[in-house]
């Protein structure tokens, strides 16, 4: 993808620089910790009962973890041990937290809307959407991940910080941290990374200058490989000391890092969080499907940028809206033609999405940190044969 920078000098003179910023956070960030616990509870349910209905919320604060929500399942998830195991895996002492659990069954009104006919033996295709909402999927050709470059850079930084901590390469790093990457664009072309902010928890006696040297040696070269970052300003722990972190420093909640989970400021967000929700909740499954469609449109070279927006009504299977926006980068047809092709080529019902993307597999705790998009091992990231789709636009 380095050729994306070749024509920077020849861009039109009237195109003014623009700046975009993307953020990512480590697993020990209090909000992400809550997402991770919620998705671990979801996985425990799906592992034993793929038809589980889960809406799990978590709050983490000083000395306390509270798990609450609506769960209907034949599984018997050990919520307390799930919380303890997650805390230990992230890097916190589970003995330091009192765990409270407030789980009850899904509302019968919601259950009746999602599965109105199943009790009478109807096919699973009658599954209605678990809620109303708007879901957005986005893709572009800036990186091999089909994501904006600063989004990928931020995700890489967090991943490398996690690896450096867990392997002991940089032993002074703590579980909590966040990064921010600002990039200059000329039109739609990324030109250079201008600013990188790294705020990372550390031990009391850590030499910050030595920590900066270790990041320069082990993290930044890999994080920015293939990216124009030579002149980037690196700002490490701008608040100064960062010894106390996680829930001891800030209260965390599920669903508080929506833009970190998706595309930063490059695409709008419908407002529905992902973590802790089973795939009948279109907040999650609809967003995954929208990303899958957008990525395949770009990967097939129908467009260089694509945004797919879906909207659902609770209890109804078919979306009430399908919109495609290629920002003028599709030469094959108009965007309304692409939207019509999406309706014809894909089953956009909750049951159809679940089947297409195999969403009853217990994989969700792996999505909770590092971004839900851009990693090839997730089924909504696969690039498929688009011949059927293309036939609908010809």
What would you call each of these model-derived segments?
Residues 61, 305, 311-394:
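Internal helix-turn-beta structural module
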Residues 27-46, 142-159, 277-301:
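Alpha-helical support elements that line or immediately flank enzyme active sites
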Residues 21, 63, 81, 88, ...:
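Glycine-rich, mobile lid/loop segments that gate access to catalytic sites or pores
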Residues 55-73, 314-318:
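Short, charge-patterned binding micro-sites
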Residues 23-25, 29-34, 128-143, 243-267, ...:
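Conserved phosphate/anionic-ligand binding catalytic regions in large, soluble enzymes, centered on
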Residues 52-56, 177-183, 232-236, 302-313:
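A short glycine-rich, hydrophobically flanked beta-strand micro-motif that places a catalytic Asp/Glu
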Residues 206-297, 301:
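Glycine-rich anion/phosphate-binding loop at the beta-strand->alpha-helix junction
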Residues 2-55:
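N-terminal, positively charged regions that mediate nucleic acid binding
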């Amino acid at each position: 993808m380095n050729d994306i920078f070749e024509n920077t000098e020849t861009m039109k003179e009237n195109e003014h620089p623009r700046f975009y910023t993307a953020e990512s956070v480590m697993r020990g960030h209090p909000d992400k910790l809550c997402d991770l616990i919620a998705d671990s509870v979801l996985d425990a349910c799906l592992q034993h009962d793929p038809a589980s209905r889960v809406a799990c919320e978590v709050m983490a604060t000083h000395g306390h973890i509270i798990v609450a929500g609506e769960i209907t399942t034949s599984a018997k998830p050990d919520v307390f041990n799930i919380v303890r195991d997650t805390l230990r895996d992230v890097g916190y002492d589970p003995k330091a937290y009192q765990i409270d659990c407030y789980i009850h069954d899904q509302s019968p009104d919601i259950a009746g809307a999602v599965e109105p006919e199943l009790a009478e033996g109807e096919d699973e295709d009658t599954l209605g959407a678990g809620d109303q909402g708007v879901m957005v999927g986005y893709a572009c050709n800036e990186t091999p991940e089909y994501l904006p470059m600063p989004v990928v850079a931020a995700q890489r930084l967090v991943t490398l910080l996690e690896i450096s901590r867990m392997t002991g390469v940089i032993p002074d790093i703590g579980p909590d941290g966040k990064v921010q990457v600002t990039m200059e664009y000329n039109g739609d072309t990324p030109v250079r990374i201008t600013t990188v902010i790294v705020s990372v928890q550390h031990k009391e006696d850590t030499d910050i200058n030595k920590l900066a040297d270790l990041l320069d040696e082990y993290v930044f070269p890999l994080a920015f490989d293939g990216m124009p970052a030579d002149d980037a300003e690196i700002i490490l722990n701008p608040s100064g000391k960062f010894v106390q972190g996680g829930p001891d420093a800030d209260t965390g909640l599920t669903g508080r890092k929506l833009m970190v989970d998706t595309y930063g400021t490059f695409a709008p967000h419908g407002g529905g969080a992902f973590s802790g929700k089973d795939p009948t909740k279109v907040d999650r499954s609809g967003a995954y499907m929208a990303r899958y469609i957008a990525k395949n449109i770009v990967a097939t070279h129908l467009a260089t940028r694509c945004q797919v927006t879906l909207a659902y009504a609770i209890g109804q299977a078919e979306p009430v809206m399908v919109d495609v926006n290629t920002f003028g980068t599709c030469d094959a047809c108009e965007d309304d033609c692409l939207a019509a092709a999406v309706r014809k080529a894909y089953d956009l019902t909750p049951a159809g999405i679940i089947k297409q993307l195999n969403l009853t597999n217990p994989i969700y705790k792996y999505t909770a940190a590092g971004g839900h998009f851009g990693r090839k091992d997730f089924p909504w990231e696969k690039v498929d044969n688009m011949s059927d789709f293309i036939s609908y636009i010809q």
